[in-house]
């Protein structure tokens, strides 16, 4: 093989390998953008960004954990956790697969069950691709150091009762006023 043919082959191989690398980067960017879109439409900000429930979301701590708790009768008070990749107060030690599993099953990597305000029942039918896209987006965020309070209450390991926020025997519907 002549030097010019060898140089041409080497140049072509470099171009092709760069293309593969760029293709992988583009696919990763698309996955992150898909995750950003899904996080937006399912309103993760509502429960996981400080100040949102007070009408002033603190975007400097975007998805860094809530400062407003949710009381679940009989179980206690729970706060939206820090979803950023901070290793001490967020999801920094979780893999994308572990995040996707938690979103769709309600189980954390250490076996705990996510707090009842987390709408796992709504997310259990997400495709694996969409759950991993959410995880990729969360891992792409800047880490926010924010340890949320709690949980507080009689138990830290909710049982199957978790989705019954108001027990059926305690719920009394209020009829509409006459004429409405």
Q: Residue spans of the language-model regions?
A:
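Local sequence-structure signature of Cys/Sec-based thiol-disulfide redox active-site neighborhoods
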Residues: 36-42
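Flexible coil segments in periplasmic/lumen-exposed cytochrome c-class electron-transfer proteins
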Residues: 30, 41, 49-78, 109-180
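Short, cysteine/histidine-rich loop/knuckle motifs that typically chelate Zn2+
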Residues: 46
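Short, intrinsically disordered, charge-biased short linear motifs at domain edges
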Residues: 28-35
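Sec/Tat signal peptide C-region and signal peptidase I cleavage site
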Residues: 21-27
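A structural feature that tracks compact, well-ordered secondary-structure segments
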Residues: 88-97, 101-107, 120-123, 135-137
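Bacterial N-terminal signal peptides that target proteins for export
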Residues: 1-12
